[in-house]
Structures are given as C-alpha cells and as structure tokens.
Amino acid sequence: MAPLRRLANLGLDLAFPATCAGCQREGEPLCAACRPALDVRLGLPGGTPIGLPAEIPIPLLQLDWCAPFTGTVRTALHDLKYAGERRLANPLGAAVARRWARIGVGADIVVPVPIHADRERRRGYDQAALIAEVAARDLRLPFVCALERGRATVAQFELGRDDRAANVEGAFRVRGRGTGNTGGTGPSPGPSPSLNPSPSPNPVRGRWVLLVDDVVTTGSTLAACATALIQAGALAVSGIAVARER
C-alpha cells in the first residue's frame, strides 16, 4: 500500500498544489516558516498541561499537547478536518512525534481517538487516525486502530465543560481485532511497524498505549477512551493532542 499512497499523494500535489495553511503561499500544506507554530511547547518539560496534577483525568497516566489551538495551528486542524486537506496530517503528526520524543515518557503502541463510523463515511477519513499514523511512523511504534465509537455523540465543542464527560461516557470500546492501518489512503510514505503479523484478539492487553487526538479541551474524550483501554487490559494509557483549546 505504501507505493500506492506515495503515488496518490504525488498525483494530488501535481493536480492541486498545496497552499500553506499559515501564510497561504503555494508549495507545501504548512511551510517551513509556519511549522514552528506547532513546536511552541517543544522545549518544555512533560507534565500536566491541563492544570494541576489532580486535574488530569484519572485513567490517563499523562496528558500533553503541542501548541495552543490558535492561529496557524487552528487553521491547519480546521483544513484537515473540514476542508479535505489530508496532506496536513504529515506536519501535524510529525509535531506530535517530536513532542512525545522530547518528553521521553515512552509507549508501546499508538492508538487514535476514533470518530463515529457514520461521520468517517461522510468525511471520507478520520483526521485523528491520519495524524496518529504519521506520529507512529516517526516514533517507530506500532499504529493500531484499537478503538471504535459504539454510539454517536454530540460534537464536544457544542457542549459546556460540565456536559462533555457525560457526552462521551461509555461511548468507546476496544475492537475485537487489531489493525495496522486506517482502512483508507493515509498520508504516510511508508507503513508503521505492525503490531503482529496477524490480527490480535486484544491488541492492547499488557501494553502502554499512547492515545492521539487532534484537539483537547477538558480531556473528557481522552479519558473515556483510556477507561475503555484500561478495562480491556491496557497496562497504562497516556494521551497527546496536536493542540489544546482553552
């Protein structure tokens, strides 16, 4: 699949030259001058960016993020999610990998926070899965779509802080079988290491999971995912997002 993905991305670049989400110059989906917006926290120590240690949702060992949900970062995430600009998954996923590698905490597998299957069919892809696949590739970790949404939920941005946890409580479950790809034409130039040569009945048991999402606000969605993973036998769960919205 990797050669086909490279050809597909090359064809896309030739037919529709990328325009930078930050400065609108043609050439790259996020140019070299605008990419530093993704790394504003790169030199900071790992910790508890949502607030005090007690504010981390209990199922998560750690929660981190790359940049504030403002300016260039906000535009890039919006264009990936709503404008079909899949090429942005490459710089966004690479930023996630850089941040996680810098704080040096570790993980065994990378798992994306899934959108509901109906929404993925309408959009044509899952933006968090595209980001997570690139991050897994750069971290040289297995990429596993281990979670699914068992029910549709209201978009978190439409809810207040107090309603977000209730909205996603019990919404996620671990898939019966693991997979090494998103099921679509992702942006990565090569495959991430596979978890096993054949599907596993429980891809998370005994493993430290790194959850990847596009945006985190209260951490409720990541916490709900972590709960499902821990109940399925995951050893520990950490979370990271491209951006944090306050």
PLM regions and their residue ranges:
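Glycine-rich phosphate/pyrophosphate-handling loop used in enzymes and phosphotransfer proteins
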Residues: 1-246
